[in-house]
């Protein structure tokens, strides 16, 4: 069984913000594969289904971003999913909106949601799909930028990014991660 986690913040005011691009990616993936995110426990909303013949759980933690690990750890324990079978999708300030990058491990890189996952999962060896949201233009502060909705002028690019993230997450199910990185990075 595989687990794909999108990081974000719960609540309507965060719905289409840059920090919630991980949630947007999970919603797009769920829609593509007909998986309903109707389960609600372990401080998360999630759904299970089949992708490429493999059972998969798609997860959106309902903790705030900085506590994401509190939702993911118990869910992995419940389903007996190994950390190496997890892909985490989240926003990255250091990549422009149209860019994305796969990584098999590493530090949190200043991302508090990833920091929480590393802390609760006990390893930095967490597979990730980082979706670029870009750096804020001056004088906008980072905290304000990531909590801003995407501009109308960014919507077409955002839809392409979400479509690409669906393809990558789908291929994660049956493709060795090194091959996945070679294909998409």
UniProtKB/Swiss-Prot annotation:
GO biological process, alphabetically ordered: protein quality control for misfolded or incompletely synthesized proteins; rescue of stalled ribosome
PROSITE patterns (alphabetical): PEPT_TRNA_HYDROL_1, PEPT_TRNA_HYDROL_2
Domain of life (superkingdom): Bacteria
Stabilizes the basic form of H active site to accept a proton, annotated site positions: 91
Residues that bind tRNA: 14, 64, 66, 112
Protein localization: Cytoplasm
Keyword tags: Cytoplasm, Hydrolase, RNA-binding, tRNA-binding
Pfam families in the cross-refs: Pept_tRNA_hydro (PF01195)
Active site: 19
EC number assigned by the record: 3.1.1.29
UniProt catalytic activity: an N-acyl-L-alpha-aminoacyl-tRNA + H2O = an N-acyl-L-amino acid + a tRNA + H(+)
GO cellular component terms, semicolon-separated: cytoplasm
Broad enzyme group: hydrolase
InterPro entries: Pept_tRNA_hydro, Pept_tRNA_hydro_CS, Pept_tRNA_hydro_sf
Protein family according to the UniProt entry: Belongs to the PTH family.
Oligomeric and partner information: Monomer.
HAMAP family recorded: Pept_tRNA_hydro_bact
Name this protein carries in UniProt: Peptidyl-tRNA hydrolase
Organism: Exiguobacterium sibiricum (strain DSM 17290 / CCUG 55495 / CIP 109462 / JCM 13490 / 255-15)
Originating gene: pth
């Amino acid at each position: 069984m595989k687990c794909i986690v999108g990081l974000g913040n719960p609540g309507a005011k965060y719905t289409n913000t840059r920090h919630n691009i991980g949630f947007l990616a999970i919603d797009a993936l769920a829609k593509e594969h007909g998986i309903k995110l109707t389960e609600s426990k372990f401080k998360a909303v999630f759904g299970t289904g089949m992708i490429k013949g493999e059972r998969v759980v798609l997860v959106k933690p309902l903790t705030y971003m900085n506590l994401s690990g509190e939702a993911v750890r118990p869910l992995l324990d419940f389903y007996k999913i190994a950390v190496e079978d997890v892909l985490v999708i989240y926003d990255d300030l250091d990549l422009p909106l149209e860019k994305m990058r796969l990584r098999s491990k590493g530090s949190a890189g200043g991302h508090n949601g990833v920091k929480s996952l590393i802390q609760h999962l006990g390893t930095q060896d967490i597979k990730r799909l980082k979706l670029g949201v870009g750096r804020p233009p001056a004088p906008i502060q980072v905290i304000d930028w990531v909590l801003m909705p995407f501009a109308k002028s960014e919507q077409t690019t955002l839809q392409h990014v979400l479509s690409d993230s669906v393809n990558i997450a789908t291929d994660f199910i049956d493709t060795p991660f090194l091959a996945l990185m070679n294909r998409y990075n």
